């Protein structure tokens, strides 16, 4: 089987054609030990991770399969005014893999969703929304400052204020209505969901601290500060550290 594949498919949730990249371990005798759905930063296509990390090397040394859908403007969320990227991530991607690569046999207990920037928030939200699909999520970098986006004091080079309103809707004061991931986490903890989380930022940052506090009710959360200004500049370093956290050492 080729280590890198491009799968083009129709995504019913988006009602349009979509594409994902798949990176498999190159060693035929190496069992697949876990699957990692990788989301690039906001606005990125399915090739972003291929261009920014040595995924073939990491897949072959860790026994991991990497799955990379296009992020575009959705960041792993269903848009308030636009496409249902969240549903496509949690549903269409898995249906297509069952059809095209049934030998992967993805299992929820070994499937992670990983994101950068606002897609890191999308990854956390995806795992909390569908704990039947994922065993956990990683936000490679600090949890985005939701309050700053909510009051209009933060945006990104791709997600302008207008695009943010399309993504998350708009409150009466005109600011984007941002999903409250901490509330969703608290709900899942009460339900006894079996999830794990990795946050690649400083534990003292407000949103990271709030997320960890909510995790203290029973859901494991690991915070790793690698001292980098932004993980988007060195994504492979964060990804390698996350693999050390999420994938048990091979015998």
Regions found by a protein language model. Name each.
Residues 1-251:
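Non-catalytic cap/lid and distal C-terminal segments of serine-dependent acyl enzymes
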């Amino acid at each position: 089987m080729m280590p890198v594949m491009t799968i083009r498919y129709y995504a019913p949730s988006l009602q349009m054609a979509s594409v994902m990249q798949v990176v498999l371990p190159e060693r035929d005798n190496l069992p697949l030990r876990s699957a990692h759905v990788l989301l690039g930063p906001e606005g990125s296509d399915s090739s972003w991770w291929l261009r920014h990390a040595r995924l073939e090397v990491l897949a072959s040394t860790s026994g991991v399969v990497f799955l990379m859908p296009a992020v575009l403007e959705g960041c792993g969320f269903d848009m308030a005014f636009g496409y249902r990227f969240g549903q496509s991530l949690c549903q269409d991607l898995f249906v297509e893999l069952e059809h095209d690569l049934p030998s992967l046999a993805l299992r929820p207990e070994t499937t992670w969703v990983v994101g950068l920037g606002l897609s890191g928030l999308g990854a956390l939200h995806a795992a909390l929304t569908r704990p039947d699909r994922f065993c956990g999520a990683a936000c490679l970098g600090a949890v985005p400052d939701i309050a700053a986006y909510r009051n209009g004091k933060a945006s990104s080079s791709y997600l302008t204020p207008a695009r943010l309103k399309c993504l998350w809707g708009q409150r009466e004061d005109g600011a984007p209505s941002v999903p409250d991931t901490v509330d969703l986490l608290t709900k899942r903890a009460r339900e006894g969901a079996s999830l794990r989380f990795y946050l690649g930022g400083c534990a003292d940052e407000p949103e990271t601290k709030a997320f960890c506090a909510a995790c203290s009710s029973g859901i494991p959360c690991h915070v790793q500060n690698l001292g980098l200004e932004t993980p988007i500049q060195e994504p492979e370093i964060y990804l390698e550290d996350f693999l050390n956290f999420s994938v048990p050492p091979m015998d």
